[in-house]
Amino acid sequence: MATWGAQHRRFENLMRYRIRDILLVSSPYDYFTLEEDGRLNELLLVDYQQLNLSYAPRITHAATGERALDLLKERPFDLVITMARVGEMAVHVFGRRAKEIQSGIPVVLLAYNTRELALFHEGDAIDRIFVWSGDARVLLAIIKLVEDLRNVDHDTRAGEAQVLILVEDSPRFYSLFLPQLYSELMKQTGSLMAGGLSLHHKLLRMRARAKILLATDMEQAQELYSRYAPFLLGVISDAGFPSEGSHDPQAGKKFVAQVQRESPDAALMMQSSLPENRKVAAKLGVEFIDKADQSLLKGLRSFMRANLGFGDFVFRLPDGEEVGRAQDIAGMRKLLPTCRASRCAT
């Protein structure tokens, strides 16, 4: 078992890429709407503090695409989030020019409604499309998704960080689901350490949390799985999504079945707004949640606690009898002497 000193050095080496400066591009009206519930910088800071994250990025606003391009020429940014209306410039033209000024900078489009979604698509100019629903936590999800994608290669190999793959092609749904998924992942990661470590050590260990990677079609899902199968913690997949250029209602079943065969220890869950897909999941023997269910978050939380290693530490005798249960590391340490004497196992 690695010593704390070795683990400390390993954790410090993770999450090398961090988003510190964000350029937000929107019309004054759109910016006013975004800040209707409070200043974005302050809301983001509160979200980071509540989740025990060590820093919050700074947001700089530009009212037009031209002004944003000038700012990109003046100083570096880590991420561009743009609304659809950026002055006289088309948003795809803006995204392309932004990447010409700062090579490799991620550009995320934040749309307002379904009509806007129909007008835009991901490509060379736009890396990802999200939908604003009034919940500022979508900004945290965007930030963490970009960071995870940039850090996953290094962190899986240097620190053995695990990977959770989300397969979902609806920007509207993943814009609602990802903030919940990230919040729950961070809360449950933190709960395992409650009372057992100093704040500094907790912040370090948060760097080693599972990376969330988003795929919006079968080709992306297969690529992510092929690359990170040795580090796979689990898969949450929609029942139907695009495959080979067209919608395949059986794509989720096919992908989950493949992962089930090749990575039998991975936690698997299907989600769908079609009730009949519950039977598909049951036949595969995997968890299922209804995307239209008001208790979706409760189902997600139960899945994570039961299947992703976030439940209690349970100590049992060789015959299966439970002799102890701990909710965090501190509780586990108290039980260890008794369990050693009883020769129990987790």
What are these regions, as identified by a protein language model?
Residues 230, 246, 253-267, 273-314:
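Polyanion-binding and phosphate-handling cores
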Residues 1-60, 87, 96, 119-128, ...:
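Non-catalytic signal-transmission and effector/linker regions of two-component phosphorelay proteins
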